[in-house]
Amino acid sequence: MTSYYYSRSLANVNKLADNTKAAARKLLDWSESNGIEVLIYETIRTKEQQAANVNSGASQTMRSYHLVGQALDFVMAKGKTVDWGAYRSDKGKKFVAKAKSLGFEWGGDWSGFVDNPHLQFNYKGYGTDTFGKGASTSNSSKPSADTNTNSLGLVDYMNLNKLDSSFANRKKLATSYGIKNYSGTATQNTTLLAKLKAGKPHTPASKNTYYTENPRKVKTLVQCDLYKSVDFTTKNQTGGTFPPGTVFTISGMGKTKGGTPRLKTKSGYYLTANTKFVKKI
C-alpha cells in the first residue's frame, strides 16, 4: 500500500530537471520501500513566487535552486498528518542520510539560515541540469567549487574523533584556524582537515551573547526549533520548527546546567536566547 502523499509527491518530483528528478525518484521510491512517509510539497518555483518568499523572509535570495528545477521541499508525514518537527527524528535522519547519499545537499546543515525542508541537487552547479534530455549516465551531484558541500574525509575524521561535524561548527573551527569565508569547498575542507590533524592551536570562536532577562516578546531571525526542556537535544525537540520572523511571547527564563540561558515561551516550550537567532521587539 502506497503512502497517503506518494502520488502528490511523485507529481511534484516529475516537474524537476532531468538529473535532479532521477535522484529524487530514487529517494522517493526508497522511502516508500522502507516505510518512511514524506510529502514533497514543492519543487519548481516561479520568479514571482521566489520574490514573494524573499519579501516575507521565507527565502534569503533570488538565486534559488527551485527556479532551475534542482531543489525540493519536504516534510515528514504519517498518514494524512504532516510533522514539521520531525526532521531530526529517526525516520527524518534516515531520509536525509539517503538523500545525501544520492547527492542532495540538506538545508538543515546550513549555518545562519537553516532550511530544514530544503534539499538541493547541485549537480555541476547552479542551473546546470537540463529539461527534456533525460538523465546522464552518471547523474551524481558534482558541486562547483563555491558550493556549500561536505568533504567526507573531513566529516569522517571529525565523527571518528567525536567532534561536532555540523557545518556551523566547521565554520567556527575554520575561522579560528584562520580560514576566511568558509563555505565548505573541497579546498577549505582539505586545509581544515590538515590543521585538525596537525593539532595546531587555535583561538576560541567569538562568544555568543544571550538574553539574560525576560525580553517579553521576541522575533526569530532564523528558522528556530522549540524544545520541551532547556536541554536542546533531538529527543526534546518536540515543539515544532518555525520560520524567520515568527513572534513569540516569553513568559519566563530558564538555564541549562552549564548556565546557558533559555527563553520559556507562553506555550511552555523553550526557545534559544541567543541574540544571533532571536531579537527583542
Swiss-Prot record:
Enzyme class: hydrolase
Pfam families on file: DUF5776, Peptidase_M15_4
GO cellular component: extracellular region
Swiss-Prot/TrEMBL GO biological process terms: cell wall organization
Keyword list, A-Z: Cell wall biogenesis/degradation, Hydrolase, Secreted
Domain of life where this protein originates: Viruses
MF annotations from Gene Ontology: peptidase activity
E.C. numbers: 3.4.24.-
Subcellular location per the Swiss-Prot or TrEMBL entry: Secreted
Family, similarity comment: Belongs to the peptidase M15C family.
Function: Cell wall lytic enzyme. Hydrolyzes the link between L-alanine and D-glutamate residues in certain bacterial cell-wall glycopeptides.
Name of this protein: L-alanyl-D-glutamate peptidase
Organism of origin: Listeria phage A118 (Bacteriophage A118)
Lineage: Viruses, Duplodnaviria, Heunggongvirae, Uroviricota, Caudoviricetes
